[in-house]
Regions:
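Active-site-adjacent structural elements that line small-molecule/cofactor binding pockets in enzymes
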Residues: 1-309
Length: 309
């Protein structure tokens, strides 16, 4: 089981704080450091000092780490043009010596688009944009060196793209998709995804989504083991009830609710819950660390949860 640290910097974090978390992620033996890709905070938090750009952050971390994998969970397709995004991620793959993964989604947070003047079309059009971006990015990365890439879609047209730089990873960095796996998203996942993520859902619901993805993978003629499955869950781990109550209060969450809808409890309880997800096929868990200053919790997970998995 791979444990990955997942941060939400839009809720309030500086680059320096994220660098500290990434270094701890590497030093403590976790598999990866991921971050969200948002420009606006959510809920009753100030979000200060303000948003940080996901891919600039990861570029910095690529030069400050040597082992952990790096990526977004997930980047909205509405934020960037697919050609420049393919270039950025390929460059970051070189900067990190092949440690980058691209999480991509259709985009959902209308308020952040309005706040920063980013167009936010209806859901059907966002899915069209999302699908075309996957085609373009995958096509640019897979085009043989020395050949050009062309694409004519409803939203993007590329003519004679040189399709460089090439990523270090061959044929391309892993692509992570996620969501409820409705018919269209399941088909896109079966065509493009290396990993499917279901975030913040109970075990049974997670498994039901995975069943739909497995069926789509089979219909696409792919090998069953060519798709990795993952979950993202808010984490709240402590050795005793007092510590759990303190961490839950810091999150502004009810502890009983966290036990139901997250990874909350003692190390043994959290290891057992991760085991339940493992039974659904999950082989990597994104631990949503809402407080980037709480490195003690990461140390506890590394020392007392990881060995039980």
């Amino acid at each position: 089981m791979k444990l990955r640290v997942f941060t939400e910097p839009q809720q309030g974090a500086t680059y320096s704080q994220l660098l500290t978390v990434a270094r701890a992620t590497e030093d403590l033996g976790f598999d990866a450091f991921f971050r969200s890709d948002h420009y606006l905070h959510m809920g009753d938090v100030g979000g200060l000092p303000g948003p940080t750009d996901a891919w600039i952050t990861l570029a910095g971390l690529a030069r400050e780490t040597s082992r952990i994998r790096l990526g977004t969970l997930v980047s909205p397709a509405t934020f960037r043009l697919p050609g420049p995004l393919a270039i950025s991620v390929a460059q970051l793959d070189e900067m990190s010596d092949g440690r980058v993964e691209l999480g991509l989604g259709a985009g959902w947070f209308a308020e952040e688009h309005a706040a920063y003047g980013i167009p936010f079309p209806g859901l059907a059009e966002r899915y069209e944009i999302f699908a075309e971006q996957l085609t373009v990015i995958d096509g640019l990365w897979r085009t043989p060196l020395g050949q050009t890439f062309d694409f004519a879609g409803e939203h993007y047209t590329l003519t004679g793209a040189p399709a460089v730089p090439k990523p270090v990873q061959w044929p391309r960095p892993p692509i992570i998709l996620g969501g409820a796996a409705k018919k269209r998203s399941a088909a896109l996942a079966a065509r493009y995804a290396d990993e499917y993520n279901v975030g913040f859902k109970p075990v049974a619901e997670t498994n039901a989504v995975f069943d739909r993805i497995r069926a789509a993978v089979a219909r696409a003629g792919r090998e069953a083991d060519s798709m990795a499955y993952s979950t993202a869950q808010v984490v709240c781990v402590a050795k005793d009830d007092a510590g759990l109550a303190r961490r839950a209060a810091a999150l502004g969450r009810d502890l009983d609710e966290l036990r139901t809808n997250g990874l909350a409890g003692t190390p043994a309880e959290v290891a057992d819950k991760i085991g339940q997800f493992a039974d659904t096929g999950v082989d990597r868990v994104y631990l949503q660390l809402m407080d980037p200053t709480d490195l003690d919790q990461l140390e506890l997970i590394a020392a007392d949860v990881s060995p039980q998995l």
